[in-house]
A protein has these predicted regions:
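Conserved alpha-helical scaffold segments that buttress catalytic/binding sites
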Residues: 2-310
């Protein structure tokens, strides 16, 4: 793999995730970490996801690479993980930010690596799916969230609840093999779930997970995606606020930390080609606990990349 020149990309250097080196220091990087410090700035009460990457990076310094007996190897070394820094975006400037995100990820894919990103709010998922689709045209989506983000979109443009609406309408994912899981709580408009169904997505509510159990959910997820290339979107508000209070739209009755991490362990071997972890809002966190959990989710994401079929 050629060494990557970041000079012409809209990136800014920041604290490396788990002290990972930059791409210039790797010769065969399989995973590139990218921060997406963007939010629409439109949430009526909880603006702050733009600060998510910096908080996750800070908490990642507490993590250690070895976790026996589950994995007794260093995933950063095995995958030659490189930290590309943060995309240089201005929150609220949607079209400009989306173009920059796509440009960075297109370059990352061209380098031979796969992206592991941290946001940022859910609006930033759309440009990432666009870039993934260009690399993997038969892409499917696995979306863990308390909201389906498949609302009817406003004529004025994008918002945090429409990323998967646009992904379906732009033909970026095969909706027949894509799924939302963990959905619960209140919605700001009537018919949100019905609209997601009309788009073709399968939706598993949190109440369904309570009945089938985590092992049952894992079976459903694996069967849905099969051997297809998977875009894994992990919205941190899929967790209960008791373990992840620092998110944009908390909703009680979610996954415990143990359950969420077990799901990630359970889908090992799927063909994960991109993962984004989003919606951490540091101003609403408690002692950095949500950001630390997000950093752990990203570490589990590295294991998923290590287990994907070659």
């Amino acid at each position: 793999m050629p060494r990557v020149d970041l000079a012409d990309l809209p990136l800014r250097r920041t604290l490396p995730f788990m002290r990972a080196p930059g791409p210039q220091e790797r010769t065969a990087s399989r995973v590139g970490i990218v921060g997406v410090p963007f939010d629409c700035g439109a949430h009526p009460l909880r603006v702050g996801a733009r600060l998510g990457p910096s908080a996750i990076r800070e908490q990642s310094q507490l993590l250690r690479p070895f976790n026996p007996p589950d994995f007794d190897f260093d995933p950063l070394a095995k995958l030659q993980v490189a930290d590309w820094g943060d995309v240089d975006v201005v929150p609220g400037q949607i079209e400009d930010a989306f173009a920059k995100i796509e440009r960075v990820l297109d370059t990352l894919y061209a380098s031979g690596a796969l992206p592991l990103t941290m946001g940022g709010d859910g609006a930033g998922t759309l440009p990432q799916i666009r870039a993934a689709h260009r690399k993997f045209p038969d892409l499917v989506a696995l979306h863990l969230d308390s909201h389906a983000d498949s609302n009817p979109f406003p004529e004025t443009g994008h918002d945090t609840g429409t990323a998967f609406t646009r992904a379906a309408q732009e033909g970026l994912v095969d909706v027949a093999h894509s799924m939302h899981a963990g959905i619960r709580g209140t919605f700001r408009m009537q018919g949100s779930l019905e609209h997601s169904d009309k788009l073709g997505y399968e939706t598993i509510l949190m109440r369904d997970i309570e009945k089938m159990g985590i092992s049952g959910l894992i079976e459903r997820l694996r069967a849905k995606c099969g051997a297809r290339p998977v875009y894994l979107c992990f919205d941190m508000d899929v967790f209960d606020p008791s373990c992840a209070p620092g998110v944009c739209a908390p909703s009680w009755g979610g996954l415990t930390a143990r359950e969420g991490l077990a799901i990630l362990r359970g889908i090992g071997g799927l063909n994960i080609v991109a993962m984004d972890v989003n919606t951490i809002s540091p101003p609403h966190d408690v002692g950095g606990m949500s950001a630390l959990l997000a950093a752990n989710v990203m570490l589990e994401g590295m294991l998923l990349f290590a287990q994907r079929p070659q």
